[in-house]
Each structure stands twice: as structure tokens, then as C-alpha cells.
């Protein structure tokens, strides 16, 4: 492009140099100069304006005419969203407005301030002219809509209805027929459905007092019109200035917008145009408006949550009255209420839907007729072959032909009825699908809006500043996400705390501690034939920043979460069976418990093991792969003194069973887990159903418990983070001792973030010991009286701090409500039971894996020849993801899921039940709960008749 020529064109257009403009346009037409006739200025005097904008604004008619003749875009927008028509109307240049209209300038385009050309002009004559042109253009669109409906041109009809300013869907021709009338009497089914979905009223009558139903041609069209009585007409956006009452600020002027059943308010009109800086919103589901007779401008809206919002129409508002607002609010409230509370079909809709029994009966009748026809034809052919065509045979021959002919007619009639019955439902079912999609859209948008605003509110509360908009979720964790609170104990080495490691070397605890650290550092211990464990994965994880879990979940509203197929990018390269194996990372605590003689100290170690079992989940927001039915996993760790086998024993519901045992026969650890998922809108909660059992064989003791609830926050907006909460009750079934641990929810300002507290009690509920710490860091034990005294004093200090904050507004604004980095205060006399090992330096690039998790999917040729073909390590999609081959992992995951579905269908056809190989269902021997018990014989290595699942 010749920028110099463009600058000259802009300059001459601004100054009205018609001859120079004409010469430039001629050279451009001859291709002697390559320049854009719609170029935009870059200097201060013409920034973002085209030559046509400048000529219209400064009133140079000849220049405008030459530019339009040369092909300048008549509806081109400048940087403020104005068209040349906006500029000509604003400056009151009637002759230029008429010229632009001759070249089909669009009068309905809205600029950046939300105004059309007629709304920016100050000349009444120009406004009247633009209104007349607008009516003419609108009528042309209506005629095109009527023609498209008559001729069945669905594509053109859809394009017209999807315009920014669509024609009136209930417009009429000279006979009073609406587009729906036209589609009905021409039997254009798809056009009728589109019109109904766009708000066409099926109850309007033409000049002959006929509804569309009266003109409908064909049973299908009549059924569509009868079955769509509950359609709500398409809502138009309604907006304008309103005063809004506030408890703290009194009456403030906002630009208020009604759209899709939502009332939103903004500080300025341009903010509403671009949908930015929204100050608040309310969904109008079941909203009720009230007015005061003493004030013609005031009205109130009572929302579904019983909140009341007061609004006042500005007294100088000429175009909008209180009645206009009330009517618009009523329409949007009805729309939102309809789609947000339509839980079940009405009686009329139930009648429109043919039952499965009727469809089956119709099909069976058709099949019976078909079978009769086959028999008659066979007999007929046989008779022909045996017939010598004697005269005496002719009457019987003709009679048989009539029978066959009659059977054929009956078959055709039956099949036609059957086909009509099925096709009759198509329109109704398509419409119901559209309704559900619209309902889904409304609900998902409402949920996303609430979550986003709640997120902004909590962020503003944490930062101590007033919210930029009203209401969303757990934002202070974004501030915490980069903190090192989970590693704070590494800075507490100088604290004098009595620990099992310091006082119990004779119990062998140091030996187990050293063996664990040796393993994490890549030692030489043998495990499944691997001499030296890897310290990283073959490929780092892919960034998930460009992907949104909400974009997937919003399409799955109403589905069971366990059945939702997530893209592989949200996974981590481990099966859920391998994730379960991470319970064993701190096995030294079990060995330690087995070696202790005091039952209370044993309970302390078991409690520490139960807490440590969930520690690896911190920052592990990747989803493990769902195990396939029959999938197994084994792990042998000579260095840690255990071996484990697990199997996916059920697919729906998904249940994983595991069994681990000490290599020195000192313990057995087993259980079955069914992660029951719940979607709470802003978070996904996983409640691990199932009993965990630990048996200390040397003491003939058994402990049972269930894991806490795990919750992933900020599904819709913000950074994902994980929380564990709920009570965990560990029972010693021999002594009757009980340990009750409370995994605390974080609270609004994170004071209880990751905290775990509880007591060990005897069977008479006497407190024997207190436990406290964080599931991400450590666990301590202390005398219960000392702990209670500390808690009482801590509560008192907290209240004093709260009061002091309330006294100083400036302090409140400056203070960040984030927990102290050294967040576990060690009470004097405490005993350290467990402390988490630091994660490897490359953990953040390796799905936040611990050193223990890093080796779970490791495999070599020697191991491959030993493990069964159902082992997770041989699963191709997990292996591909571990190697960084995301596309292949996705393809393999899809292939395995389809293979699993096909196998399930084959079993259902053959009425064959699935049989688990290594576990069987039965009651837990200690609490009687339903459980999966290890059947034995896995370690004999006789792997015959294993299913082909990969």
C-alpha cells in the first residue's frame, strides 16, 4: 500500500479539495497507485477516521459523492464505532444524509455509545427523515421474511432472524398472514420451527380470523403448531438510564440493561455496549415488581432470593417511562422463570409424546403383516411352479392372487402408519431439544456470571478494596498459590520439639526414615526389578492455561460426573489405581506402629499415616485416568518393605480395590474406594466412599477409617486449588480406642487453611492425646490439656486482633488476609509424628508429582515380562501422555473407551456377568460394611485367561 497516497487522500477529503481527490481516485482506478480508499488516519487530526468520515463531518458533498462512486464502504466504522451517516447526522448536514441513504446506508447501526444515527442528530428534520427510512428498511426486511417463509428458504429466513436488528417475527402481509401463517399453509416444517423458536406467536389471526393452525397443511405441521404452545417470544434487549438505591451510597445513576432474563447495571453506557465493568446484576427468575402510587417514577423489584432493589426513572426521560420498564421486566422475568423452573412436561406435552409401548406395538403390527406377506408370496410362487395352467385351476389361481394383493395392501398401510407415527414425533422432539438447550444456556450463563462476580468480590475483600463488581469464589487462594506455606516446616528446625525420631532410635524408625529418603533420592534399592529409580518423567507436562474445565463441564450439566469424558490435557499420566498406591509413600509409619508396645502411640502413628496418605494430593489438579474394568496395578518396594496389588472391580459405579502387605508379615492394608463426585457449580467435590482397613498382625489389631472429602475449587474462574475437609474417625477394633480428626475447611480468609486437629480417646471417650498440624506439611501430638489451653488462648487473641482491625479502617485496607508462612505454631511439649518430604525441584513441570509418584509408571523389559498384561504400566494412552504425545494419548484413550463399551455390549448380549479376578465382594470383617476382599494367589504369577482390555 502507498501510505503517502492514503495520507494525501485523507488530507484532501478533510479540506474538501474535490479535484485532488478525483485525481487520486482515478490513479487508483488505473492501478497506478495502490491505496485503500477506506484507509484510516494515523495523525492526531484524523486518527481512526476514513476519508468518507472526514468529508461527511466537514460537509464536502462533492468529495462524498466521488468517494461513494469510487466504491468507498458506506457503512464503514471509525474507531468510535460511528458510520459516515452518524457524522453527517451529528453535524446536521441533510444533503449528505440523503446522499448516503441513496447508497443504502444502514440507519440501524449502533455506535460505541449505543446510539443510532437518528439519536445523535440535533436536527428534527433529519431525525424524522431517518425514522421514515428506518421504517422503510424495516418493511423491506419484513417482506423478505414473509417471502422466505412462503418459499421455504430456511437459510435466508435464519439469516434474517439472526441479524443484529431482525425484522418483526410477527409482521403480516396484506391478508394479515404472519410468516408462521405462510410456513403453515405451505407445509414448510423447518421454517415453522425456526419461527417458533424465534418467538412467533401461533395464536395471532389473519384478516379472515384464522390462526396458523387453521391453515396448516399435513399432520406434522399441525402437530408442531399444537405442541409448541409454551414458546416464549424472543426477547429484545432493553436498556436505559435508571437511578438505583444503595444502602451506603443512596441513589446513584446507572445505565441499566435487560437481556436474556438478566438485569445488569453499569456506570456508563459505553461499558454496557462492550459488556465491561459491570457493577452488578440480578437474574429475574420469579421476580415481582411493585410500585408506589405517590411516585410515578419509582418501582421495586423483589427477586427470587427475597432481595429487594429500588429503581427510579429519571424525570427528564422522554423515551422511557416506568410502565415501559415494568413491561420489559415482566417479559424477561417470565422468560427466565420459564427456562429455569421448567422441571417436567405439562399434561399437554405428555399427550404429544407417543409412549415407547405405542411405538413398539405399531412396529410389531407391521412386522406381523410383513411375515404374512412373505408366507403368501412363498405359497403363491409354489403354486405357480406346480400349476399346469389347466382351466379348472384358473379360479383358484386368481383367488390366490387377490389374497396376496390384499396382504400387500395391508402391509403397506401398516408400514405407512408406523412411519407416520415416527416422523410425527420429529418436529416435537426437535423443539423439545431446542427448549432444553435454551434452558441449559440460561442456567450455565447464570452460573458462570455468579461464579465470576463472587470471585471478584472475594478478591476485593482480600485486598481490602471495594469490589469492582458484585459477587465469586475463593480468590485469596490465587494469592496463596505461589506461597510456600506447605513447606513452612523446613524453617522450623530450630524449634525444640520432642519427636519419635529423637527418642525412639531403638524402635527402628530411623532405619525406615533413611530408607524412604534413599528411595526418593534415587538409591539402589530393588523394586519390581528396577535398581535405580528415575527422578523425572520422559517429558514435562503441557500447559493447561489455554484450556478451561468449565468449557467442558458447562456442556455436561445434568450428566453424572463419573460418565463425563474429559479431554486428555486435564489428565496426569497415572491411573487412579496408581494414585491409590500413593497411600503407601509413608509406609515407615506403619512399620513404626507395628514396633511400638503402647496402643496410644500405635494409634498416633496410624493417624499420622492416614493424614500422610492424602498429602500427595496438594497441587495435584490433574485428573488420573479412569481405570478400565479388569485393569490391575502392582508395586513391590523392598526398600519400603511392602508389596501391593489393586484391581478395578466395577465400572458403574467405579470401584477400585487394593491389598498391600508387609514383606516381613507385620501388617496388611486393604480397602476399596468409590469416589462419588458432586458438581457444586464453582467446585467439584470427590467423596471417597469405602472403608480403609489396616491390620497390625503382631498385635492382632485392626484399624478402620474413611478418607476426608477432596474438593477442587475455581472450576469456572481463577486458579485451581485443592482442599481436604471433613471428619476422619479411626477405630481400633481391639481396644476400642478412637481417633477423631477434623480436616478443617479453609474459611473465607484462609485462617484454617489445610489444618488438621483431633483427639485420641479411649472407649469411655476420655481424651488421651491431642493431634494437630496440616495435611500438607506435618502432624504433631501433645497432651490434651495443654492443647485445650492453647486453643482457648488462641481464640482470645484472634478476637482481640479482629477488634483492633475493626478500629482502624486504614489497617484493614492494607492488610492481606493470608495465613502466616510459618502457619503451624508448635505447642511446647509437642511430639513430631510425621513431616512431609520436600518434592523434587522439577515437580512443577512434572504434574506436581512427588518423588514416590514419579516412579509409579516406570517399567523396563524385565518387569514387562513379569507383570500381567492388565497392568497400568502397559496402558498405551497413559504411556503416550507420559512421553508427551498428547494427540496419540487422546486417540488411544478414545480407542480404549470404545473397546470397553463394545465388550460391555457383547457381555449384555450373551448375558454373561463380569467376574473379578483378584478380589471378591463381601462384608468387611471388622465393621460389616460392604467391601472388596483380596482373593489371593496373585503373587503366584499364574496369569491365565486375563481379559484383553488394552
Swiss-Prot record:
Region called Disordered, residue ranges: 501-527, 795-816, 881-913
Region described as Interaction with RAB7A: 1-237
GO biological process assignments: bile acid biosynthetic process; cholesterol metabolic process; vesicle-mediated transport
UniProt keyword annotation of Transport present: yes
Residues found modified as Phosphoserine: 499
GO molecular function, one term: sterol transfer activity
Protein name per Swiss-Prot or TrEMBL: Oxysterol-binding protein-related protein 1
Gene: OSBPL1A
Amino acid at each position: 500500500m502507498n501510505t503517502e497516497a492514503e495520507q494525501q487522500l485523507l488530507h484532501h477529503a478533510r479540506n474538501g479539495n474535490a479535484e485532488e481527490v478525483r485525481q487520486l481516485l482515478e490513479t487508483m482506478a488505473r492501478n497506478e497507485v495502490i491505496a485503500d480508499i477506506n484507509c484510516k488516519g494515523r495523525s492526531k487530526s484524523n486518527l481512526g477516521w476514513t476519508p468518507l468520515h472526514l468529508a461527511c463531518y466537514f460537509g464536502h458533498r462533492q468529495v462524498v459523492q466521488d468517494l461513494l462512486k469510487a466504491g468507498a464502504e458506506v457503512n464503514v466504522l471509525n474507531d468510535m464505532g460511528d458510520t459516515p451517516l452518524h457524522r453527517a447526522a451529528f453535524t446536521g448536514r441533510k444533503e449528505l444524509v440523503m446522499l448516503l441513504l441513496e447508497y443504502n446506508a444502514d440507519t440501524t447501526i449502533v455506535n460505541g455509545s449505543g446510539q443510532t444515527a437518528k439519536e445523535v442528530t440535533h436536527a428534527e428534520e433529519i431525525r424524522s427523515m431517518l425514522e421514515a427510512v428506518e421504517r422503510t428498511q424495516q418493511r423491506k426486511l419484513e417482506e423478505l421474511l414473509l417471502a422466505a417463509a412462503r418459499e421455504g428458504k430456511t437459510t435466508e429466513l435464519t439469516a434474517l432472524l439472526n441479524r443484529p436488528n431482525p425484522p418483526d417475527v410477527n409482521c403480516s402481509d396484506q391478508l394479515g398472514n404472519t410468516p408462521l401463517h405462510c410456513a403453515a399453509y405451505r407445509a414448510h416444517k423447518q421454517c415453522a420451527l425456526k419461527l417458533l423458536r424465534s418467538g412467533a406467536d401461533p395464536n395471532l389471526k389473519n384478516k379472515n380470523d384464522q390462526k396458523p393452525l387453521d391453515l396448516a397443511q399435513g399432520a406434522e405441521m399441525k402437530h408442531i403448531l399444537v405442541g409448541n404452545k409454551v414458546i416464549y417470544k424472543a426477547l429484545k434487549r432493553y436498556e436505559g438510564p435508571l437511578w438505583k438505591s444503595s444502602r451506603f451510597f443512596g441513589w446513584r445513576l446507572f445505565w441499566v440493561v435487560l437481556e436474556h432474563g438478566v438485569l445488569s447495571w453499569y456506570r456508563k453506557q459505553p461499558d454496557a455496549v462492550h459488556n465491561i465493568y459491570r457493577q452488578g446484576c440480578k437474574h429475574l427468575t420469579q421476580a415481582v415488581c411493585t410500585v408506589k402510587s405517590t411516585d410515578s417514577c419509582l418501582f421495586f423489584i423483589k427477586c427470587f432470593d427475597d432481595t429487594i432493589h429500588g429503581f427510579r426513572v429519571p424525570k427528564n426521560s422522554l423515551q422511557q417511562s416506568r410502565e415501559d420498564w415494568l413491561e420489559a421486566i415482566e417479559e424477561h422475568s417470565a422468560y427466565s422463570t420459564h427456562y429455569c423452573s421448567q422441571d417436567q412436561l405439562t399434561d399437554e406435552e405428555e399427550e404429544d409424546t407417543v409412549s415407547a409401548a405405542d411405538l413398539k406395538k405399531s412396529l410389531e403390527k407391521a412386522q406381523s403383516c410383513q411375515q404374512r406377506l412373505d408366507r403368501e408370496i412363498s405359497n403363491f410362487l409354489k403354486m405357480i411352479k406346480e400349476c399346469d395352467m389347466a382351466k379348472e385351476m384358473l379360479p383358484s389361481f386368481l383367488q390366490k392372487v387377490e389374497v396376496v394383493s390384499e396382504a400387500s395392501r395391508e402391509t403397506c398401510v401398516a408400514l405407512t402408519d408406523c412411519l407416520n407415527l415416527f416422523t410425527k414425533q420429529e418436529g416435537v422432539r426437535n423443539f423439545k431439544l431446542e427448549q432444553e438447550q435454551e434452558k441449559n444456556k440460561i442456567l450455565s450463563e447464570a452460573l458462570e456470571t455468579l461464579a465470576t462476580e463472587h470471585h471478584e468480590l472475594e478478591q476485593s475483600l482480600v485486598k481490602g478494596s471495594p469490589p469492582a463488581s458484585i459477587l465469586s469464589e475463593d480468590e485469596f487462594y490465587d494469592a496463596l498459590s505461589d506461597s510456600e506455606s506447605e513447606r513452612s516446616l523446613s524453617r522450623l528446625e530450630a524449634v525444640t520439639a520432642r519427636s519419635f525420631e529423637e527418642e525412639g532410635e531403638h524402635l527402628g524408625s530411623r532405619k525406615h526414615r533413611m530408607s524412604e529418603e534413599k528411595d526418593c533420592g534415587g538409591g539402589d534399592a530393588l523394586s519390581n526389578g528396577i535398581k535405580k529409580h528415575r527422578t523425572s518423567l520422559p517429558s514435562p507436562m503441557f500447559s493447561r492455561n489455554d484450556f478451561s474445565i468449565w468449557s467442558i463441564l458447562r456442556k455436561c450439566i445434568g450428566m453424572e460426573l463419573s460418565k463425563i469424558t474429559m479431554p486428555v490435557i486435564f489428565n496426569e499420566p497415572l491411573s487412579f489405581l496408581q494414585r491409590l498406591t500413593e497411600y503407601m509413600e509413608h509406609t515407615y509409619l506403619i512399620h513404626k506402629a507395628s514396633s511400638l508396645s503402647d496402643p496410644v502411640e500405635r494409634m498416633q502413628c496410624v493417624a499420622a499415616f492416614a493424614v500422610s496418605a492424602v498429602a500427595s494430593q496438594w497441587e495435584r489438579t490433574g485428573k488420573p485416568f479412569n481405570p478400565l474394568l479388569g485393569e490391575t496395578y502392582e508395586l513391590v518396594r523392598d526398600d519400603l518393605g511392602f508389596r501391593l496389588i489393586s484391581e478395578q472391580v466395577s465400572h458403574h459405579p467405579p470401584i477400585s480395590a487394593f491389598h498391600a502387605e508387609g514383606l516381613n508379615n507385620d501388617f496388611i492394608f486393604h480397602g476399596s474406594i468409590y469416589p462419588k463426585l458432586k458438581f457444586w457449580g464453582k467446585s467439584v467435590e470427590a467423596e471417597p466412599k469405602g472403608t480403609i482397613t489396616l491390620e497390625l498382625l503382631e498385635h492382632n489389631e485392626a484399624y478402620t477409617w474413611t478418607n476426608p472429602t477432596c474438593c477442587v475449587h475455581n472450576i469456572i474462574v481463577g486458579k485451581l486449588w485443592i482442599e481436604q475437609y471433613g471428619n476422619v474417625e479411626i477405630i481400633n477394633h481391639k481396644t476400642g480406642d478412637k481417633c477423631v480428626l477434623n480436616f478443617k475447611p479453609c474459611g473465607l480468609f484462609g485462617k484454617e487453611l489445610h489444618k488438621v486437629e483431633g483427639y485420641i480417646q479411649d472407649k469411655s471417650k476420655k481424651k488421651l492425646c491431642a493431634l494437630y498440624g496440616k495435611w500438607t506439611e506435618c502432624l504433631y501430638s501433645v497432651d490434651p490439656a495443654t492443647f485445650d489451653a492453647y486453643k482457648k488462648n488462641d481464640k482470645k487473641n484472634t478476637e482481640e486482633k479482629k477488634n483492633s482491625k475493626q478500629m482502624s479502617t486504614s489497617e484493614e485496607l492494607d492488610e492481606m488476609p493470608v495465613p502466616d508462612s510459618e502457619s503451624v505454631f508448635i505447642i511446647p511439649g509437642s511430639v513430631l509424628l510425621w513431616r512431609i518430604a520436600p518434592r523434587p525441584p522439577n515437580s512443577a513441570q512434572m504434574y506436581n508429582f512427588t518423588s514416590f509418584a514419579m516412579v509409579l509408571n516406570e517399567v523396563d523389559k524385565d518387569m514387562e515380562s513379569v507383570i500381567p498384561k492388565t497392568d497400568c504400566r502397559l496402558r498405551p494412552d497413559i504411556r503416550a501422555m507420559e512421553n508427551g504425545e498428547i494427540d496419540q494419548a487422546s486417540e488411544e484413550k478414545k480407542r480404549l473407551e470404545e473397546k470397553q463399551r463394545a465388550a460391555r455390549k457383547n457381555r449384555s448380549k450373551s448375558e454373561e456377568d463380569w467376574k473379578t479376578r483378584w478380589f471378591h465382594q463381601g462384608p468387611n470383617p471388622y465393621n460389616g460394611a460392604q467391601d472388596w476382599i483380596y482373593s489371593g494367589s496373585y503373587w503366584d504369577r499364574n496369569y491365565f485367561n486375563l481379559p484383553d482390555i488394552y
